Amino acid sequence: MSINLQNVSYTYQAGTPFEGRALFNINLDILDGSYTAFIGHTGSGKSTIMQLLNGLHVPTTGIVSVDKQDITNHSKNKEIKSIRKHVGLVFQFPESQLFEETVLKDVAFGPQNFGVSPEEAEALAREKLALVGISENLFEKNPFELSGGQMRRVAIAGILAMQPKVLVLDEPTAGLDPKGRKELMTIFKKLHQSGMTIVLVTHLMDDVANYADFVYVLDKGKIILSGKPKTIFQQVSLLEKKQLGVPKVTKLAQRLVDRGIPISSLPITLEELKEVLKHG
């Protein structure tokens, strides 16, 4: 499922004394089966774009096209509902949205809300809970009895149970320790390898380098760079000027260059750095 934004602008609280422009004439494509990352400083417009992709916001001007279905300023909620089924949105700290009395019921709620039978919804819930690493002995537990990391996995399973074709992740590993973050990113990697389109908002440049295949860089509501991670992270000075930084190995390689060691193309992953050091 591909997504396209054409001349999209968005204004919060339009027509009030508090109105503020969040996006300016955004044009972008998210290709079917891609792993696209959005990076930018706080207030750059990343989260607004995520909510446009899912239909939580409609554009003030322009068109958001999801699998050739257009969302405009005049779109009605019933027209957008099918898009929300196909584009799953995982907010920061999604565990805050858990509410059912058991883990299984919570994950099954979403598909039932879209008209799936209780039996099929339970089967989907069991499948997706297993996918995110929640063992069956936890299915009848109250979600709030679980650890923070487990609660987050349950919340993500609830999104996956609705069988989206696109998974939009807004800082999905926020607050997790390195082990928990790596485990969660590995789950998303496997989903991508299975054919799901992944959209990631993150401030962790190492995750962008290791997982994404395309990157958009936002600043003050505008796209200032776009391209493959390898290309984007060559722009060290610009990214640092925008307070974004680069992957750790890229920063190390740049220091070597600054000391006179020739490196034709800065590495962005540990594997690339090893190759650079090996071949000189």
Swiss-Prot record:
Its EC number is 7.-.-.-. Residues 3-245 form the ABC transporter domain. It is a peripheral membrane protein. Gene3D superfamilies: P-loop containing nucleotide triphosphate hydrolases. ATP binds at G40, H41, T42, G43, S44, G45, K46, S47. It is found in: Cell membrane. Forms a stable energy-coupling factor (ECF) transporter complex composed of 2 membrane-embedded substrate-binding proteins (S component), 2 ATP-binding proteins (A component) and 2 transmembrane proteins (T component). This is Energy-coupling factor transporter ATP-binding protein EcfA2. It comes from Streptococcus pyogenes serotype M28 (strain MGAS6180). The lineage of its organism: Bacteria, Bacillati, Bacillota, Bacilli, Lactobacillales.
